[in-house]
Amino acid sequence: MLKIAILGRPNVGKSSLFNRLCKRSLAIVNSQEGTTRDRLYGELHAFGVPAQVIDTGGVDHNSEDYFQKHIYNQALTGAKEADVLLLVIDIRCGITEEDAHLAKLLLPLKKPLILVANKADSRQEELQIHETYKLGIRDIVVTSTAHDKHIDTLLQRIKLVANLPEPREEEEEGLEELSVDEHEESEAALPSNTFPDFSEVFTEGFSPEEPCTIPESPQQAPKTLKIALIGRPNVGKSSIINGLLNEERCIIDNTPGTTRDNIDILYSHKDRQYLFIDTAGLRKMKSVKNSIEWISSSRTEKAISRADICLLVIDATQKLSSYEKRILSLISKRKKPHIILINKWDLLEEVRMEHYCKDLRATDPYLGQAKMLCISATTKRNLKKIFSAIDELHHVVSNKVPTPIVNKTLASALHRNHPQVIQGRRLRIYYAIQKTTTPLQFLLFINAKSLLTKHYEYYLKNTLKSSFNLYGIPFDLEFKEKPKRHN
């Protein structure tokens, strides 16, 4: 995979360029210096080959700021990792001492290096290009990311210095045909006007004691799982990422709000790829005092929507806060499978460990039957178990429960606990199917919705949850009345 690193001093437009290249707003763009702190990764789809763009934080080697040392190291790591380097400067300011320092730092790496003279918003500013020659960089492209000027020229230059081949026409046509075919695929809809009579389906041919097993789906190439790490500031999300990857990819500090961007990190483990989304901590809106914090908070909500599975990280040494309850509510509303990671487990006393999880489940209804994993990012206790927990949860979500097993399970539930009689009638379930996988939903055909009580609906839902191991997987039951026959 071709990797392209964007480097430069603070506030020259690196994140704006990153967003232009990736065609979506991944990096936070703001006039405040130091907005980007960690390395951000995005996909570039312009060359016909897999390509990745790395956005690094603004470098100021003379600064004594605590974060600058980490940002500097992150930028150097990104430069060493990349195949092509883009040094971004602000053409309106001329060549600064920091620009010259970065050029001297990058030239000895002997990698393709392009100087991006950004913020050339007018023709007069474009003519200042002669100032840039003193840096000793041969390839120079003048751009204005604010006005989307000359981005195509930059892409062509990247393609040239990276020696990328021209895509063959046959391959492009094949890709177009494939995408058209995929859009034409659709699931057959259930008939809404006629249903077979399954009145006896729950009274014959089953054994309540017989265990249900879900057959696995046919083997397919494993998809890249998008995993969002969610939690309030300073609970250890970035430490968990660094522990899983065995390298410092996220800047860690005790100050809440160290992570500002959502950081996409692609990682391979046992033949499967995981895209970890390390999010900025979610806060109450009234405590968000500036635009950067507000954008970070909204990005956390977007990360939940993007993710296949959410990992909610909580601090074992602190009580469950209203922030975490809000996150749990968001995850549930988005119908996202999730796992609760209880971090800083090493700091708990043994006496508290025995009752902690039980007490925690009692604090919020969403935690009642969620999957929990006690970990320590500091000692790396149970960190590797996170992968197996994710895989297990994904396996349950991606394997559709066969219709006969759904019906058999519900038949057993009715056999154990009969619905109550309401006005001389009793609820009957004729037939049931798993309607969708993501989000998970079951469709039950019944005789009358007026005979279904909330209590019995809750009982049916718990039966399906325990039978098919749906813990940590929000799902819905949809009830549909069977049309009455007309003679």
From Swiss-Prot:
Occurrences of domain KH-like (ranges): 399-483
UniProt keyword annotations, A-Z: GTP-binding, Nucleotide-binding, Repeat, Ribosome biogenesis
Feature: compositional bias, Acidic residues: 168-187
Pfam families: KH_dom-like, MMR_HSR1
Region (Disordered) residue spans: 165-194
UniProt cross-references to InterPro entries, sorted A to Z: G_ENGA, GTP-bd, GTPase_Der, KH_dom-like, KH_dom-like_a/b, P-loop_NTPase, Small_GTP-bd
Repeat listed as a keyword: yes
Record-level Gene Ontology MF annotations: GTP binding; ribosome binding
Residue numbers binding GTP 2: 231-238, 278-282, 343-346
Assembly and interaction partners: Associates with the 50S ribosomal subunit.
Biological function: GTPase that plays an essential role in the late steps of ribosome biogenesis.
Similarity comment: Belongs to the TRAFAC class TrmE-Era-EngA-EngB-Septin-like GTPase superfamily. EngA (Der) GTPase family.
Name under which the protein is recorded: GTPase Der
High-level lineage: Bacteria, Pseudomonadati, Chlamydiota, Chlamydiia, Chlamydiales
